[in-house]
């Protein structure tokens, strides 16, 4: 088996080297060597060549030019290798990215010892850490003594409400509501009466003023009786003053003669 594997690996290497050389040959100047019938590609693991069948690939040592078909010098090959290396270095970039641990991974690492959480509000820890539920206490049966019976009866009487109490309370509330309605109606009626009285007084005042204007227009320039009395008083006062003034003038004129 080792001989078969070594022969298969050497044949695959030779095939690959031959293909590279054929690809490197230019299309002019040199004639390509005749090639044998191509075999379908076989995987290296499944390639099992028999020991008695020789390989059809040309060996490098058997070439006439000792593997140097292009007749190149070592300096030229070094120069080409240097250029290719510079080209590859310029086109290839190596990025060093430090991957930060995710939050989920951190939480998972922190909770490895405590298990996992089913919900967000779950408390970490096993079931042994949870407090055991307290057992429900059963209600003790009531004693049949007379004191307990009397006390229970008293509580029932306090909690019980008779139908008469309910009717009485509803009647009181109903009476209060009726009285409130009556008071509201009386207030509304009083407001209406006050507004009617105000309107009546306003109309009466307007009617009196209108009548006075009409009477003044009918009488024309005649003055009212009050103004006549004032004029009479002024006339009598002037007459009394005129009657008192002549004797003083005559008394003053006598010494001049």
UniProtKB/Swiss-Prot annotation:
Low complexity composition-biased segments: 1-11
InterPro entries the record matches: CUSTOS
Coiled coil: none
Ranges of Basic residues composition bias in the record: 180-190, 227-237
GO cellular component terms, A-Z: nuclear envelope
Comp. bias intervals (Basic and acidic residues): 32-41
GO-annotated biological processes: negative regulation of Wnt signaling pathway; Spemann organizer formation; Wnt signaling pathway
Phosphothreonine: residues bearing it: 73
Protein name listed in UniProt: Protein CUSTOS
Organism: Bos taurus (Bovine)
